[in-house]
UniProtKB/Swiss-Prot annotation:
Residue segments, region Disordered: 162-201, 269-311
Free-text description of this protein's post-translational modifications in UniProt: Ubiquitinated by TRIM11, leading to ubiquitination and proteasomal degradation.
Name of the protein this chain belongs to: Paired box protein Pax-6
Keyword Transcription regulation applies: yes
Length: 422
């Protein structure tokens, strides 16, 4: 085997792919199981996979044999017609019988041997087939009745004549006979169960031990386990053994409990994180004020005195060229509007106006950047001064789309830009 092995399993043991374990290893597995070792311990000791150990032990507890089944080819059919008829008979005698009980009866009555006994899954498959055949027979009888009723062309008075000839009313009589037969044979089944061999009973008890049962913990045990879980989520083997001696539980059960408790704690922690994130989300995204803050922001009051247009002059300048240019323009109605329209003075630093960047020149004293309001925006203007300063040096506009326009510094060429600004 060492020269022909085709792989190494997770535990470091060698195996031949597609070939069963040697009989010596199988015998050791059974001996360790009888000595009280768990399948997981046997797997580590013999370096055999846990699934292989469980399968060999399960077959041993059911059949008492450690020999492997047939390799290659098709397995011999164990559900022969004789076995199927016996299974159907047992099911008729006791409709609530289990598959493993049928299997034990087949062995005890000598219908099958350990070599050709069908497995529990095979017996369940036979029972499903029998149930489906019975249901199909009942459905066929109903279809026959419907076909006969649909094919009848006589009057309503002749239709009841078909009912006695159908197969459906006959079924309750047949079921009644089966129930009577079952009632008569239940005593036989009880007596046959009482005559089971001691070996089958021992195997049955070992099989019961192999099957898992849910452990019900007392309140004291749960409190002790929870207290230990608060101390550490991963107790070592010494802590588990100490806890097992304290609360009178197997160490394996305690290990399983901690594994399940850790999984529950992870689920609860995930839910707590989700709730924490959900509670923190609204503080970052205000919903009620999103429209007002993103579209229409209120314009704050200016902190510095601001002067605006008056009806007498547009630009507070002494230059005759600019004065003549302005006087040549047609009068704008925006300078003589009513006083009842509200106006909020904007901040000059905002970009909501046309900025006429007029550089300083020798003929202009203290000239800086001026703001000018286009005609279509003048409806929001007030003819009275908005600032507190007496000097009229800068004109203001209302909020709007701002486009900076730079005007050259030469004074004689300034007149060509005024029509463009209108």
């Amino acid at each position: 085997m060492q020269n022909s092995h085709s792989g190494v399993n997770q535990l470091g043991g060698v195996f031949v792919n597609g070939r069963p374990l040697p009989d010596s290893t199988r015998q050791k597995i059974v001996e360790l199981a009888h000595s009280g070792a768990r399948p997981c311990d046997i797997s580590r000791i013999l370096q055999v996979s846990n699934g292989c150990v469980s399968k060999i032990l399960g077959r041993y507890y059911e059949t008492g044999s450690i020999r492997p089944r047939a390799i290659g080819g098709s397995k011999p059919r164990v559900a022969t017609p004789e076995v199927v008829s016996k299974i159907a008979q047992y099911k008729r005698e006791c409709p609530s019988i289990f598959a493993w009980e049928i299997r034990d009866r087949l062995l005890s009555e000598g219908v099958c041997t350990n070599d050709n006994i069908p497995s529990v899954s095979s017996i369940n498959r036979v029972l499903r087939n029998l149930a489906s055949e019975k249901q199909q027979m009942g459905a066929d009888g109903m279809y026959d009745k419907l076909r006969m009723l649909n094919g009848q062309t006589g009057s309503w008075g002749t239709r009841p004549g078909w009912y006695p000839g159908t197969s459906v009313p006959g079924q309750p009589t047949q079921d009644g006979c089966q129930q009577q037969e079952g009632g008569g044979e239940n005593t036989n089944s009880i007596s046959s169960n009482g005559e089971d061999s001691d070996e089958a009973q021992m195997r049955l008890q070992l099989k019961r031990k192999l099957q898992r049962n849910r452990t019900s913990f007392t309140q004291e045990q749960i409190e002790a386990l929870e207290k230990e879980f608060e101390r550490t989520h991963y107790p070592d083997v010494f802590a588990r053994e100490r806890l097992a001696a304290k609360i009178d539980l197997p160490e394996a059960r305690i290990q399983v409990w901690f594994s399940n408790r850790r999984a529950k704690w992870r689920r609860e922690e995930k839910l707590r994180n989700q709730r924490r994130q959900a509670s923190n989300t609204p503080s970052h995204i205000p919903i009620s004020s999103s429209f007002s803050t993103s579209v229409y922001q209120p314009i704050p009051q200016p902190t510095t005195p601001v002067s605006s247009f008056t009806s007498g002059s547009m630009l507070g300048r002494t230059d005759t060229a600019l004065t003549n240019t302005y006087s040549a323009l047609p009068p704008m109605p925006s300078f003589t509007m009513a006083n009842n329209l509200p106006m909020q003075p904007p901040v000059p630093s905002q970009t909501s106006s046309y900025s006429c960047m007029l550089p300083t020149s020798p003929s202009v004293n203290g000239r800086s950047y001026d703001t000018y309001t286009p005609p279509h925006m003048q409806t929001h203007m007030n003819s009275q001064p908005m600032g507190t300063s007496g000097a009229t040096s800068t004109g203001l506009i209302s909020p709007g789309v701002s486009v900076p326009v730079q005007v050259p510094g030469s004074e004689p060429d300034m007149s060509q830009y005024w029509p463009r600004l209108q």
